[in-house]
């Protein structure tokens, strides 16, 4: 029996936000298991491109490409480079972009990838095979810097305590396994009443730092602004407050909302670049109760969507 296909979070809401049309060109910037790509292809007779930096996801995408009759193409790379990657393929504009930020459930479910504290595996956490791993970061980062990483990216109030415990443990033996790290963290972070594992925030922080996820998200949003055609839609799904804050801040600024003390006060003329996006919804969209019950990962998901205006993309400082 073949396995059940992976259904991404907020799938119906993302497709509704993109509103694919038959002659459109669309980008799935975080292919993963391909759920968004397949849904976009099924929604209209359109052309779909996809990007992923995970070699496993790229191989999965190549299989879909082979049976797509020329409607789907897979590109290996980072979504933060989406505009340059598509230009290399002769594509200068797209009509919609979907982004599902962070680690996928399929990556977490593979112990050998080192993302999970629930399943022992090598302490890796890299979405691609190059660059320093989580083990390198845990074993070699000075205590103060490690505490700052855990606090900033994991929002862990006990970050100093965790960093101290890690440094003391690594003096005896370098960390190599996810289980070793999780055990050390659980000894110094008490279990909360919400049932969340004490190691959750530390693992999140390391994963974000190893993969530069927030920097990649910022670059991806700016690239999407350059790549979207006027009237094109951007749909971004996030899973924790740090990601959502980046998306919310970007879209509020680019839509002119950030410059207003109140939505009832008109935008001041000449106060900055023209709005490059118009919000499709003032508030983030969350999962329906049925989806939240069926998929625990969906509970924290938020979708923010906006339409590209005809205004030029804002200048960015690299």
Swiss-Prot record:
Q: Which UniProt keywords apply?
A: Cytoplasm, Methyltransferase, rRNA processing, S-adenosyl-L-methionine, Transferase
Q: Which InterPro entries match?
A: RsmH, SAM-dep_MeTrfase_MraW_recog, SAM-dependent_MTases_sf
Q: What class of enzyme is it?
A: transferase
Q: What is its EC number?
A: 2.1.1.199
The entry lists its GO molecular-function terms as: rRNA (cytosine-N4-)-methyltransferase activity
Disulfide bond residue pairs: none
**Its Gene Ontology biological processes?**
rRNA base methylation
Binding-site residues, S-adenosyl-L-methionine: 34-36, 52, 79, 100, 107
Please provide, in alphabetical order, the Gene Ontology terms of the cellular component aspect for this entry: cytoplasm
Q: Where is the composition biased (Low complexity)?
A: 303-318
- Localization: Cytoplasm
Q: Which reaction does it catalyse?
A: cytidine(1402) in 16S rRNA + S-adenosyl-L-methionine = N(4)-methylcytidine(1402) in 16S rRNA + S-adenosyl-L-homocysteine + H(+)
The record's function comment reads: Specifically methylates the N4 position of cytidine in position 1402 (C1402) of 16S rRNA.
Q: Supply the name of the protein.
A: Ribosomal RNA small subunit methyltransferase H
Please tell me the species this chain comes from. Answer: Paramagnetospirillum magneticum (strain ATCC 700264 / AMB-1)
